[in-house]
Amino acid sequence: MSEQEVTYTTLRFHKSSGLQNPVRPEETQRPRDVGHRECSVPWKFIVIVLGILCFLLLLTVAVLVIHIFRDGQEKHEQEKTLNNLRQEYQVMKNDSSLMEEMLRNKSSECKALNDSLHYLNREQNRCLRKTKIVLDCSQNKGKQVEGYWFCCGMKCYYFIMDDKKWNGCKQICQDYNLTLLKTNDEDELKFLKSQLQRNTYWISLTHHKSKEESQQIGDRPSKLDSAARNSVPNRQKCAYLSSFSTEEDDCARTHGCICEKRLNKFPIPGSCAKGRTQSALQRDEDES
């Protein structure tokens, strides 16, 4: 019996040990898989969150870079515009200075011209107040000649109101020991134009169409409008003075006359001065 018990015990030991402690690979690996699964889920969530944060950070950096670049461009454009405005302002300032300088110069010139004009007006009025006299003369033939004369400076001008041909004006000036007006002085012509009491007066200038040249008594050329020379074809032309210009006309037509003489020999035709004696006029000559 002892041998059976030993054998039984041995079998029972081996059997009980095999039944009570069954070892399975799945059971030994299950706790590890659960622990691994429990640990992997939080790390995935953290990675996703970190990725989103990195994306947002990169997006923010990109937006900031774009804004900084755009602000830099706008600042550069503003500085460029500001420099252009400064240059334009400087140019306008220089132009304004030049305009002010020109205005001052023009004002000075205008003032000088006004002073000269006032002086000439005073001198002109002084001359006219001293010497202007209306004459009513009669020639030896009994024909009455109306006119007036005045002196200014060293010249006296005798205006004959009767209409005569150019040769007639030349002759009547010679009868009074005068000469038909001959001048090339623009200032003198302007002065005489301002004193005209009628439209036109002959002066000492003739022009022949065939020769296309001007001839003036005293061998002095005169400036005339070339268009006026063509107004009367193939006829001798003579110059006349109007209140507007110096022009030419047919010498056979009639205009008034302007005679002249210098003060060293006063132009008194006999004793035909109306309201004045020859001695009184001579005293005027001496005083002038």
Swiss-Prot record:
One of its GO terms (molecular function) is carbohydrate binding. GO terms for biological process: cell adhesion. Residues 144-263 form the C-type lectin domain. It comes from the Eukaryota. GO terms for cellular component: plasma membrane. Receptor on natural killer (NK) cells for class I MHC. This is Killer cell lectin-like receptor 2.
